[in-house]
Amino acid sequence: MRPEIEQELAHTLLVELLAYQFASPVRWIETQDVILAEKRTERIVEIGPADTLGGMARRTLASKYEAYDAATSVQRQILCYNKDAKEIYYDVDPVEEETESAPEAAAAPPTSAAPAAAVVAAPAPAASAPSAGPAAPVEDAPVTALDIVRTLVAQKLKKALSDVPLNKAIKDLVGGKSTLQNEILGDLGKEFGSTPEKPEDTPLDELGASMQATFNGQLGKQSSSLIARLVSSKMPGGFNITAVRKYLETRWGLGPGRQDGVLLLALTMEPASRIGSEPDAKVFLDDVANKYAANSGISLNVPTASGDGGASAGGMLMDPAAIDALTKDQRALFKQQLEIIARYLKMDLRDGQKAFVASQETQKTLQAQLDLWQAEHGDFYASGIEPSFDPLKARVYDSSWNWARQDALSMYYDIIFGRLKVVDREIVSQCIRIMNRSNPLLLEFMQYHIDNCPTERGETYQLAKELGEQLIENCKEVLGVSPVYKDVAVPTGPQTTIDARGNIEYQEVPRASARKLEHYVKQMAEGGPISEYSNRAKVQNDLRSVYKLIRRQHRLSKSSQLQFNALYKDVVRALSMNENQIMPQENGSTKKPGRNGSVRNGSPRAGKVETIPFLHLKKKNEHGWDYSKKLTGIYLDVLESAARSGLTFQGKNVLMTGAGAGSIGAEVLQGLISGGAKVIVTTSRYSREVTEYYQAMYARYGARGSQLVVVPFNQGSKQDVEALVDYIYDTKKGLGWDLDFIVPFAAIPENGREIDSIDSKSELAHRIMLTNLLRLLGSVKAQKQANGFETRPAQVILPLSPNHGTFGNDGLYSESKLALETLFNRWYSENWSNYLTICGAVIGWTRGTGLMSGNNMVAEGVEKLGVRTFSQQEMAFNLLGLMAPAIVNLCQLDPVWADLNGGLQFIPDLKDLMTRLRTEIMETSDVRRAVIKETAIENKVVNGEDSEVLYKKVIAEPRANIKFQFPNLPTWDEDIKPLNENLKGMVNLDKVVVVTGFSEVGPWGNSRTRWEMEASGKFSLEGCVEMAWIMGLIRHHNGPIKGKTYSGWVDSKTGEPVDDKDVKAKYEKYILEHSGIRLIEPELFKGYDPKKKQLLQEIVIEEDLEPFEASKETAEEFKREHGEKVEIFEVLESGEYTVRLKKGATLLIPKALQFDRLVAGQVPTGWDARRYGIPEDIIEQVDPVTLFVLVCTAEAMLSAGVTDPYEFYKYVHLSEVGNCIGSGIGGTHALRGMYKDRYLDKPLQKDILQESFINTMSAWVNMLLLSSTGPIKTPVGACATAVESVDIGYETIVEGKARVCFVGGFDDFQEEGSYEFANMKATSNAEDEFAHGRTPQEMSRPTTTTRAGFMESQGCGMQLIMSAQLALDMGVPIYGIIALTTTATDKIGRSVPAPGQGVLTTARENPGKFPSPLLDIKYRRRQLELRKRQIREWQESELLYLQEEAEAIKAQNPADFVVEEYLQERAQHINREAIRQEKDAQFSLGNNFWKQDSRIAPLRGALATWGLTVDEIGVASFHGTSTVANDKNESDVICQQMKHLGRKKGNALLGIFQKYLTGHPKGAAGAWMFNGCLQVLDSGLVPGNRNADNVDKVMEKFDYIVYPSRSIQTDGIKAFSVTSFGFGQKGAQVIGIHPKYLYATLDRAQFEAYRAKVETRQKKAYRYFHNGLVNNSIFVAKNKAPYEDELQSKVFLNPDYRVAADKKTSELKYPPKPPVATDAGSESTKAVIESLAKAHATENSKIGVDVESIDSINISNETFIERILPASEQQYCQNAPSPQSSFAGRWSAKEAVFKSLGVCSKGAGAPLKDIEIENDSNGAPTLHGVAAEAAKEAGVKHISVSISHSDMQAVAVAISQF
């Protein structure tokens, strides 16, 4: 059979087999069963590229056949040919024979298994245990030139040897990186001495062959150097190059040449870090040697044993006893020598043992004491008495002046947005809180907002104005009055309901009988039936009856006995309730009106019963404490007054414990600070959450003059008790207060402890609630006594309890409370009554507290018995009443007992009653649940299983909808039209700079996710999804998972599907922990750990060191450096050198410093540029900060809707796209490598220098994305870089050097910068912050009292800016207008970082007596219209003279001159010149009118350009670094600017301090701030500084700034200011304006056309963004320029060259021939020229030329249109494609006709209907009226008209023939 037929048949067979394979089911499970069960196969070998089927077979064996094989003794082998070659071929290692000379070794135990384990761990399949002898030698062969070439290339490319194909040249392999190519060529030159011509273009195999001829087979300088570096930097200490070669020789039998080959291969397999031990190094070498053998096609031999035999375990074995016998004498000698030396040195060798024995005895004694203490007190007690008080952690809140303005503004907008619609209790409560903080600053602030409230916008604005005016009046009235606690909330009662399904619901509902606290006081005074008691007369009558019944007791009937029992009970009850009520000497006659409930009720039941109020005071007598009408009357008067007029605590100092969230104490605390008190409150659970709770409380309730101090405190600790009181009274290191009130409410529950289970917790509780409470009072007494404060006793509100063991199961709780009552007697018996007064409050049932919340459900049932339970609000009101001056005065006379029990003490068996009520509720619930369950079962039986589906509640969980939104476009009628009248056509749009895109990479991901966190303080579901993607927690998957098709998110680690709605729940905690400001994560900074910051210490060695081995080159370098202090000698066997450092040589020894800057703002953990699509080779080449810049550039373009950067070149020339991105420092990683790593001689890329330049990052942007030839400017402005960049970009566009610019800044975080900032004391000290109780997230606190330095951060921020005209033409979104950019330096000084005030010059002006008329936009409009008319007249005159010019030139050059071409070009020039002049006029009178005018400040002028004033700047984003000096200086600068420019009083800016969230990224700072302000413009939401817990008092004087701590939704921001300050006297400011002011310069048609473009672009960007997320392709690097190489110079030199879509590939690229430049108005110009030529060719004719601006015709003015156009022409114009242009053309034509008749125009108001323009080919007008008469008088026979349009104007030529 012929070969060709064989080949054809083989091909056919292969195709058929493959078809069969693909078409048939695999049935592998069945196949396995046949092989394993039916055939019982024991040895299976897989032949294939990987161990696939074998792995499946192993799993099948383990799951199905393991027990079967064990039972049948079947042993199976699963082998794969590419891993188990030796086992398949039965190629076993030779067994070493036993040595005859040591017969006993056979019986000895085998040697340690450790070496064997090491061998098993090695990846080499042929590895075996170390042997007694060397391996058999392998035939040696030197390395080839190709081996070295390929290795050097692979090592430089950081690729495996197999990934470097030999058929490719170096130029192809480096991928266009010329620097890398030059490095490789340099290495080859160093290695071989010389290289062939153009080695970069020669394939590697040819290059190696050409070098082989002159190659000597030895390693050259470069390869030897790399190998030496590998061994010294990655091998363990002592394992030098000689040891490496010796191991390769003895282990594998490799000669010098083969060793070279192995070491060359090792260069391409270099470990990431130094290998830890010698066995691990040998494992690495084994792996390399085996791969070398596989590559070289040789077989490595196993080492053989030396001698005649060897031990099976690899070495001769000896009996340990024999070894011990051999060494016994030696050890004895050593011991003897040691003892002699010790005696000589007078040392006791047993000192340590003796000390240990003594310490053991001491330890036993101490341990016994500890055990005893532990046994007696228990673990809970031990941990519960640990002190926690720390004055450093004290938080002081006193900035009520700032929170007042914040609350007033929030309330204003709440009313405007309809959240507060009616004047309800909540509004009244807010008003009272604002009144309590009333101050002149607040009044000015409110007055401005109310005076400028735009009531025409709707009812809510009118309501806001009405309420605001009323509130202002109220605030004025209380301006000099003390703040008061006044609660206007509705009193509530308990309500427990059980629905039909048996669900128990408890809620607080308003009490119908008490709508306010005044009613509540009345009810408390009235008491109830349960608190009734018999008066004196009734008791006497009852006693007489009882006496009579006793006398005839033996004759009593059954009914009489019952009567006797009832009477007796009444008498006993009356006596027990209040014995002194029947004694006239105490309270007088019962008929005398008393201050009790019966009097208040109006009808005392004299002679029958009276009531005790639910709230009453008791007085002590000889029998105990009894209800006192007199004292109770005083107390109820106080409560009534407090409910009506409020209660002030101004000037009072209070200590509170036990005021945690949800407690009575917290409500009391609110009342105290509302009343102006200074309170120190303690917390046993000190944390950020707790301090934020108290801060929020103070911000809401804190009144003028109040102060809240929060400290950590454990009342179980005696040390804390003393330290706390010392802190309060210490005038230097503490508060320096003298206490007026002590409210010690701290307690811990002891539920479930009866008398037989009193434990450690009970003892601790007793200590807290009794022992240390008394200690606390004692400490206060001692301090008052020591300071001589005898006339200012502190009132103690003792928390008593009615529970005197009544409830039980509460440990020592009742004993603790009962014991407090001894203080009532001690007050008399001890000597502290001058310092402390006692008011004991028996606190009743208070619902919702931690102790009583479990009983809420039965509270309603208990109240039905006639008693009263209390809400926390009510009980706090009761307690605050006890702190009123009247009660305080009573306490100074005698201790006061306040019974606030609500009559609860009158209920017998309360516990049983509660149990019964709870049982009834639960039984009812259970019955209803059972009924519902039964009904459901019945329903299923009757109607089917699925019948309930329609009735079940289904909660629809929202899915993530990741939007990619452009800014909201304003509506024309509501937002733009009101501005259009003044702004239309008033600016030169080519000179207006707008922001069309922005982006950032920072600690919170990107600008979208950062805004979510900044605006709302949390991530949405969409934000979590995007952050999870950014951090690599999830990725998108589209394909099969577990046999099912799946498209969606999967977990990156497990590959398991993750539903987007579950992303927030699953990943949010991790995201928050690893984003933002946090502890430095070493893995993000190449292992940098600030706790172990490495420094080098130089030392001089004092004795010769042991020699070590190095290469000849390295050894000579040591000799060169150290001279005689080093010895070097050659090792003859290896050619290496030994080096010995001698005495006097210097060494640099690393040491670790514990650095205190532990926290920084870091990009989210897991951020990876690969995820965005940046190629691997770029990531390895560039500095990490370059990656930030590249990602930002891609995202900035995407936010502008530009998905292909080459799209710019459809609209502008290559030279008009600029790059102004800058940095403060640049590539810090590159700088670190260049200076530190290079100094330490670490491996480093050769072109590291280029990556350190600050402009390199911009270069990479251009090389990978833009390919532009536009201006590149690289600002370096330290922390102000980004704003300086905006300034440069703005000027570049305004000056016409570019039309598009990328601006922004970037900087990285690096340990060197962190250390030097710390040395300057500029940054926050994390250790100090931790000591002050701050979390990392709190450490950046701009404007606060405790700010302590800025927090470093890293990232990049960017904006894409362009001229407004280009933005409109492209249809890109416009985020904001850049109205002004300025930079400034400062004065003479010596401090580089000192903050300056040079930016004040932005407001520089020296105004005249009257404001400049240029500030009036109407005045400027008049001037502009006048200038436009002049330009049109000039244009008309130039067109009229064209023919004469042409005739004159033709007369001089009759042959070559073409009149038509000349006229065409000149007319186009006139048209262009007219447009230029008009734009110049717009620029001069619109954009630029204020420049060089000392009467107008740049800031004022920039705003006036858009019709705005300084009062309309809504927000200011501050540099706000959280340093003491900057925050104060910056606020001062802004305030001075506003004041100087006449901003109205009270019109305070809202301050944004973004760095509390992001930290300070230096170069990127201004860009992030600017981005945030653009988001504020779009949303109207002003984010607050959430870390502003207490604004510094020094900021109060800056009255033009509000410092919000929470986000405030406004009704719109018109303009903003961004200020930025940088080290080195850099100050910068940017003013941004809402884009609606730009749209107001357009007409409606232009705006609608733009809107359509933007919407189309947004859809395209949305698709691109989502594809980028799914495919990791947001960044797409360009591989080539948009033009072919041969077109480069043509494209560069032709400013009109533009790209076009390639018909085949759809790529944007420059066509071979530039498009013919066409003037937009060429056709219209041609028509004008033809008309003029016709006119000059016609005798007896007169020409009229008129030019009109298209936008000068107001077509919306119907009256005007009626006067100039008849109905037929109006209809024609309205139907035209551009009605505006058509109307302008008709107007121009009529004016031209007038001019051709020789009649002067009568102006815009003249009726032009007399001239009717026909639409025929001649365009002959029909004249009527005055026009017809004028034509008749002039003898006009015929008139023709030609009309033409351009984008901006209409030109008409009329010719009248006579």
UniProtKB/Swiss-Prot annotation:
Keyword Protein biosynthesis part of the UniProt annotation: no
Looking at the record, which segments are called Beta-ketoacyl reductase? 651-848
EC? 2.3.1.86, 1.1.1.100, 2.3.1.41
UniProt keyword annotations, A-Z = Fatty acid biosynthesis, Fatty acid metabolism, Lipid biosynthesis, Lipid metabolism, Magnesium, Metal-binding, Multifunctional enzyme, NAD, NADP, Oxidoreductase, Phosphopantetheine, Phosphoprotein, Transferase
Q: Which SUPFAM superfamilies match?
A: 4'-phosphopantetheinyl transferase, FabD/lysophospholipase-like, NAD(P)-binding Rossmann-fold domains, Thiolase-like
Q: Where is this region: Disordered?
A: 580-606
Q: Which residues does the record give as acetyl-CoA binding sites?
A: 1746-1748, 1772, 1782, 1791-1801, 1815-1818, 1843-1845
Question: Which family does the UniProt entry place this protein in?
Answer: Belongs to the thiolase-like superfamily. Fungal fatty acid synthetase subunit alpha family.
* Subunit comment: Fatty acid synthase is composed of alpha and beta subunits.
Provide the function of this protein: Fatty acid synthetase catalyzes the formation of long-chain fatty acids from acetyl-CoA, malonyl-CoA and NADPH. The alpha subunit contains domains for: acyl carrier protein, 3-oxoacyl-[acyl-carrier-protein] reductase, and 3-oxoacyl-[acyl-carrier-protein] synthase.
Q: What is this protein called?
A: Fatty acid synthase subunit alpha
Instruction: State the organism of origin.
Output: Emericella nidulans (Aspergillus nidulans)
Its organism's taxonomic lineage begins at: Eukaryota, Fungi, Dikarya, Ascomycota, Pezizomycotina
